Amino acid sequence: MNNYGTLTLGAVPIGDPKDASLNLIDYIINHKIILVENVEVFNKLCKDLNIKTDARIIDYGSHDIPDEAGIYIDMLKDGQDILILSDEGTAGIIDPGGRLMQIARQNQIKVKVMTGPNAIIAPVVLARFNRGFYFHGPTPNRDERIEYFKKLQNYELPMVFFVTRAYIEDFIIDANNYFGPDRRVFVCSNLTKQNEFTTFTTLKDISQFVISGDINFSITLVIDGKPPY
């Protein structure tokens, strides 16, 4: 049994600050080291929650492990606990923390996850497809995306994609070509925020939204699997 510290993957609200758990608030207040994806976003969260922390705040700032990973591992081996937070949702899934978590486990360091808001589960629940799902996350460049779509054409489970504003039009065009215009899709953005957007429709109709300019923000798409199920 070692005396290493614990790496905790935190879960922050995906929109509404009131979704913050008591556990999250307690961890922010009492942790001495907190790795964050963006300091400004973290400071705003603390302001919204009306809390203060004396923790050392480190801007992780990357979706991959930074060169300083060894420093964090040394901190943990020295018995210091570290909390890592993404800007929204649970850290570690297509977010800061995933690679660090792997390295921590390789070094026999305890890793725990905080339950709470999740940017993947909420869209899946709202999509109402009521089955398992395939999570892809951010879409790759166009050539790689087409190869993915070819492999997923006959997949029967719903598929979850994160699409940034800059690539929405190309994504929807490719999705129509490879999944078909009549494939059902749930689209959402800014869940739990005042400007929340949700719609349950088809890929063909989503194309019209994009062409008309009604969708000009980053979105999450849950594309239904190939029928019959």
Where are the regions a protein language model picked out?
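Glycine-rich, flexible N-terminal cofactor/catalytic loop recognition
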Residues: M1-G61
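A contiguous loop/helix-start segment that scaffolds small-molecule binding in enzyme catalytic cores
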Residues: N2-L7, K77-D81, P158-Y229
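Short acidic active-site motifs
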Residues: N23, D67-Y72, E144-Y148
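Short active-site oxyanion
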Residues: I28-I34, Q108-V111, P158-M159
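Alpha-helix capping/helix-boundary segments
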Residues: E40-F42, G89-T90, A119, Y167, ...
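Conserved helicase motor
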Residues: D59-I65, T139-N141
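Glycine/small-residue-rich loop that forms an oxyanion/phosphate-binding "nest" at active or ligand-binding sites
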Residues: E68-M114, N118
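Class I SAM-dependent methyltransferase SAM-binding "motif I" and its flanking Rossmann-like core
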Residues: R99-Y155
